[in-house]
Every structure is written in C-alpha cells, then in structure tokens.
C-alpha cells in the first residue's frame, strides 16, 4: 500500500474531526444522536462523535471512503441471529421484522450479513446497505443466484 497523508492524527481522529465539523455546520439537516457515555450520564455530544470507523487495508494507492450518516437510533433495530445449519434464513428475517415495531425513520432498509463470526456478520450487514438493488428489475428478470432468490422472498407487500 502506497498511500500517505500529511497528518500526525490517526484515521479515527481525522474522521471524528470531520464528523464534528459536518454536524456543527449551520446547514446540517441531520439530528445529533450520539451520547458520551451510554451507561451512565446519557449526555448528547451534539456533534455525533465519536464516529464508528471500519478500516480495510487493500493493495494499491487508492483511498475509497464510504460514509453512512446515521444516528444510533438505527442501531435500536439491529438483530443478530446465530442460526443452526437447518434453519431457514428467510424465515428468520421475516420472523424478526414484525418484532422491530415502529420507530424507524423511512425508508426502512434491511442490511443482512450472513456467515462468519457475530461481529463479522454485523459488519457485512452494514456494508450491504451500500449495495444497489433494483428489486423491480430483479423481479422482472428473475433471480440469478441464491442471494437474489432471498431478495425476492424478503420483499414485503407495500400495503
């Protein structure tokens, strides 16, 4: 990897400064929803820091940054299921959705990570939210693999 930047700060420190700058900007329409210490005094930081930062080092000299500006409230709907090999993934997901109840801000989008350890599955679920899926096109042409079949089974009625 041949990538350098002129700073003595860590990646996390630079990202946190960027998040603070963005959330404190007068034109920012997003709500600050991160607390300093979730266990004791739940005081809002008012700048959505500290940010959650995942770093993946790959060969080359390019830098690719994906940003999800979301509050911690979206984590309130997170579900982790450790399934047995005989369990049906689609049945599990469809069984969990009604338990989520109200309280999520539209649009409701599910990120699903399958396989690996618990922490890896949760990261995969977050990363899946960056993928583009045209569900109407998928339904029209039909699924081409097992993952696409799962997408069509997970599509919920709109009424």
Indicate residue ranges for each PLM-predicted region.
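Gly/Ser/Thr-rich active-site loops/lids in small-molecule metabolic enzymes
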Residues: 14-15, 19, 86-92, 121-148
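A generic, well-ordered mixed alpha/beta core segment in the N-terminal half of proteins
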Residues: 2-61, 66-68
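Internal alpha/beta scaffold segment
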Residues: 15, 75-104
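Active-site-proximal helix-loop elements at catalytic-domain edges
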Residues: 61-89, 147-150
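Conserved small/polar residues in nucleotide/adenosyl-binding loops
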Residues: 152-158
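Conserved phosphate/anionic-ligand binding catalytic regions in large, soluble enzymes, centered on
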Residues: 1-5, 104-120
